[in-house]
């Protein structure tokens, strides 16, 4: 479930920093909706793509994670996108301030992703 007002979430669930991934996903989801994308969750085998967003003939894939703080997290977030055989843009969005883009997958800070004019 995604909420448009984080204040409601805080009132119901309280301020729990461990939920930061959920909060970041919610922010990205709302931004994609605001930009008129139709959003689904993707599946590649047993792995999940956080967002498959489509608008007309455009399509993007987005993985959201708080930080790429371990090799395990890096592999989890990038490997699912690397298995997608098409050439639509693929993003890993985090709070990190450094760029770990690889194999055509763009790693972006959430602030930069939200301020980006176009995703294609």
Tell me the role of every PLM-derived stretch:
Residues 1-120:
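A cross-kingdom feature that marks ATP-driven nucleic-acid transaction machinery
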């Amino acid at each position: 479930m995604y909420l448009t007002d984080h204040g409601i979430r805080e009132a119901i669930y309280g301020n729990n920093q461990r939920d930061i991934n959920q909060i970041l996903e919610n922010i990205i989801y709302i931004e994609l909706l605001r930009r008129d994308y139709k959003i689904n969750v993707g599946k590649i085998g047993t792995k999940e793509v956080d967002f498959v967003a489509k608008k007309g003939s455009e399509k993007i894939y987005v993985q959201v994670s708080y930080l790429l703080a371990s090799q395990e997290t890096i592999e989890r977030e990038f490997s699912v996108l690397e298995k997608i055989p098409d050439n639509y843009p693929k993003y890993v969005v985090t709070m990190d301030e450094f760029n770990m883009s690889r194999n055509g997958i763009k790693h972006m800070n959430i602030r930069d992703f939200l301020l980006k004019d176009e995703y294609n």
